[in-house]
Each structure stands twice: as structure tokens, then as C-alpha cells.
């Protein structure tokens, strides 16, 4: 898991070629305004999903995880808590291979406050819980890069 200031994102180039593609795309298009939807960067290896999400104000003990894709979360409007889960307790919802998503319960969680100035990357196998209410806005606009880690 990576949580850092956006100005430092280039430090993470070299971890994986597909992560490099996402970082390069972000630099090339950082001043662009995207409509909601999916944008292919390198087919199914790297793509961007622009979302507007209503934040979850309820307590939630389920963490999503992926086997094949890393998620790079970057908010362009608003603030949210995106929690990192540690020490998986049990499976909450069976893994769905076609969508590369499953849900687990964790013994520990670490909330990360995301805003326009920072980002988080959750690698395959790392439980995370995006879209948590941060006590400010009720919804956020975010860029979610899906990055195949093979």
C-alpha cells in the first residue's frame, strides 16, 4: 500500500510497468477534465474510471480486495476516508473472479484521509475500504486507476 502526497507520485515509478503507465497518463492529462466513465490507457492492463460517489456514513466492516489489479485512488473533488485493512479475519463475500473483487473482514483498520493533494495505491491482496465519510462533503469525484499487476 502506498499513501503519499501527489507531488511525490513520480517516486513510485519503476515498481511495475503498468503503474508507470498510470503515472505517466496522470502527468500528461493532469489538467484535463474528464466526464464520468471509463477511459482505456492500455486495454485491460491499465484503465481509468472517473466516478462520483456518495460517501458511506454508516459503520462498515467489509473490506474489498483484488487478486489481479491494484487500485490507485485520486480525489479531484472532496475528501474521503479510505481505510486499509490488516490481519484478515474471515471472508465476508466470496471472491468474484470475473470482476476481480471479494470482501473480507479484518482485525485492524487504518483510516487514510484522501483529498485533492494526495493519493493511495492498494496492491492485489491488500484489503481496503474506500468511500468513507470524512465529516465534510457528502460525495466525492475521483479518479480510480485500475492497474493489472502480473
Briefly describe each language-model feature range.
Residues 113-132:
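Conserved metal-binding segment of the jelly-roll/cupin
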Amino acid at each position: 500500500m502506498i499513501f503519499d502526497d501527489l507531488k511525490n507520485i513520480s517516486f513510485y515509478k519503476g515498481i511495475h510497468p503498468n503503474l508507470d503507465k498510470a503515472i505517466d497518463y496522470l502527468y500528461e492529462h493532469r489538467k484535463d477534465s474528464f466526464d464520468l466513465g471509463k477511459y482505456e490507457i492500455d486495454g485491460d492492463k491499465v484503465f481509468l474510471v472517473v466516478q462520483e460517489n456518495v460517501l458511506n456514513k454508516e459503520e462498515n466492516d467489509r473490506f474489498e480486495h483484488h487478486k489481479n489489479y491494484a487500485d490507485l485512488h485520486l480525489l479531484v473533488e472532496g475528501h474521503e476516508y479510505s481505510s486499509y485493512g490488516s490481519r484478515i479475519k474471515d471472508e465476508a463475500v466470496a471472491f468474484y473472479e470475473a470482476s476481480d473483487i471479494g470482501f473480507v473482514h479484518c482485525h485492524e483498520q487504518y483510516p487514510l484521509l484522501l483529498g485533492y493533494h494526495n493519493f493511495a495505491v492498494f496492491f492485489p491482496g491488500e484489503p481496503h475500504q474506500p468511500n468513507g465519510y470524512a465529516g465534510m462533503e457528502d460525495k466525492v469525484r475521483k479518479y480510480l486507476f485500475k492497474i493489472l499487476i502480473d
